[in-house]
Amino acid sequence: MKKKFWVYDIEVFENFFCIVLEGVEDDDVITYMIHPSYRNDYDDMIKFLKQEGKAGSIFFGFNNLSYDSQVIEFLIQNEADFLSKKPIEICREAWMFSNALIHGQDNPGFRTPYPEFKQTLKQIDVFKLNHWDNPAKSSSLKWIQYTMDWYNIKESSISFNALIDTGDQIRETLKYCVNDVKSTKKIVLLSKDLIKLRMNLSRTYKINLLSASEPKISKELFAYFLGQKLKMHPKDVKALPTQKRTLIRVNDIILPYVQFQTPIFKAVLEKFKTVIIDPENTKNGFKHSILNNGVKTDYGLGGIHGCRASGVYESTSDLIIMTSDVTSFYPNLAIRNKWSPGHLDAQAFSEQYEWFFEERKKIPKKDPLNYVYKLILNSTYGLSNDKHSFLYDPELTMKITINGQLSLTMLYEMISVAIPESIPLMQNTDGLETIIPRDKVDIYMQVCAEWEKITNLQLEHDKYQKLILADVNNYIAVYDWKFIDHDSWKKMKESNPDYVYKVLPEGFAYAATKCKGRFEFSNLALHKNKSHLVISKAVYNYFVHDILPEDYIMTNKNIYDFCGGVKANSTYAVQIVCVENGKETVQNMHKITRYYLSNKGCKMHKMHKETGKIISVDAGSWVVTVFNQYEEKPFEEYDINYKYYLQRITREIESARGSQLSLLF
């Protein structure tokens, strides 16, 4: 039998079970169900699943490693017993097992009954693969349906504690299950490059990385390579006990080259030297801020953050905005200074870490291996601060972040001293932006080269023609013009239509752009909230392409760009309040609600389940239309409230402009 790729989902009730499968590479749909009155497909289902397991078929799901595959394996492993049981008995036992799984996962020490390596079917979990089980990226299938503009954000209309007694209930449950399968299939297709990479890595290194998140890939492969260097099995490397630290004296970990010339930065260094850190509480261990040359800079135990007042900063014939970033800043701080977790062989760790960096430079960026080495380089820093990682050592984390802040501050100061008329705009973790006279670019580059020599780090430089700066985390940058041949220019316009394009006397030119924070709108990670994307698009087009918001917004015919998404949770319910013929009705919504602001509709708010406190979703007198189910119709019939969106866009533009309005120039 030929190996196949399936996407699947299950539904479990006390008297009903179903599994729906759809081919990834085709539209083959298979449904099995167990019900005491309608159908009992148990025998056929088990035969099919075991046959597919022998063929090496792969089963994709959403959170399937923790739930769906567990129930399936339970049904397979109990085949001998279940073949002689009635459908109602099979359903009830599957339902009881399902409930035990769901409630068990609330306990910290809970382990699923069937480890992945013992399961009959080869599984890939797109939930874990995309790291949506991480609190910072936490996302349900319904939330991802919203963020990828799925046509139907469908919740079950039947309680999972109910009994399925009618044909209508069965059809409704199957419809719900099919929608989940088809939306999961879209996630699989969107993740195909990530899946292919994990398949290749699993095959190459004989490690199961099929559902591995990026940090897990980094952890497993670092252990693999380090194990080879130390002649140890990766499991033994990961089992090495981490070094217990009771405190970290910052004065003992500051690099010798960190020195300053001016009183304000000398004081910053002295402030750091007095700090003693509790390794168990690094988040709130230290905070310090300074105001220098119009920039408030915040220091802590993470990255440096500094920003001038909001405004639109533009290069002129006399002035240029320089942007400089440290190449692989955090990895190279560890590599160049031969830092390692305290419990690992320092030389072996440093050599291996540097090997990843040097090997990556030899590999083309399009090669997936380049991406893998980048993952390892960047994730290692984060893993040094992860108690569950074999690389855990908070002192290493603090060495990197504190010396990173101080090293970048040295560059900031050196530029300010060498070019007194320079205007600092921003410092952010691994780089800085500065306005300098065009005739001082050579001096700027000399200062940067001197800093590189002192720190043994490398800088990458570019130029902006415009920086729209709301704050350090939210900005739009327009790079300087770059010239390419006509064919490349045409291809660039097709692949990056939002860039700026011109035909200048010097040739065919384009200006790339970069959007951060609330101004991002392109290629957003699926876990991110994309609410009312039309706002960030309109702001971008106003500042970058000189298109008025009222003109842009009327040309955008993508209804999803006008939609927002709101989550209900264990604390707050989402409610829709409608008034019809003077009578008010309140409807509790499901976990995820997609909506847009309309001229007619209902109010939406969140209500605290215990106190009854009301929080408006969109403050004011605005009303919304719920849009969980896509409805195609002439665009004007959506009845969009353009006034709301224009007010939000205008507010964003005014916020980004600030009080500065290019007055520097």
Q: Which residues fall in each region the model found?
A:
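Entry/capping segment at the start of metal-dependent catalytic domains
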Residues: 1-20, 27-29
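Two-metal-ion RNase H-like nuclease active-site motif
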Residues: 3-12, 123-126, 322-324
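Short catalytic/ligand-binding loop motif for oxyanion handling, primarily in non-cytosolic enzymes
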Residues: 16, 67-71, 132, 331-332, ...
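Conserved DEDDh/DEDDy metal-dependent 3′-5′ exonuclease domain
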Residues: 29-142
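Helical catalytic core of nucleic-acid polymerases
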Residues: 137-138, 158-168, 288-413, 417-420, ...
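Glycine-rich, acidic and aromatic/proline-enriched surface loops and short helix-turn segments
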Residues: 143-154, 378-383
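C-terminal, non-catalytic extensions of nucleic-acid polymerases
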Residues: 243, 249, 286, 292, ...
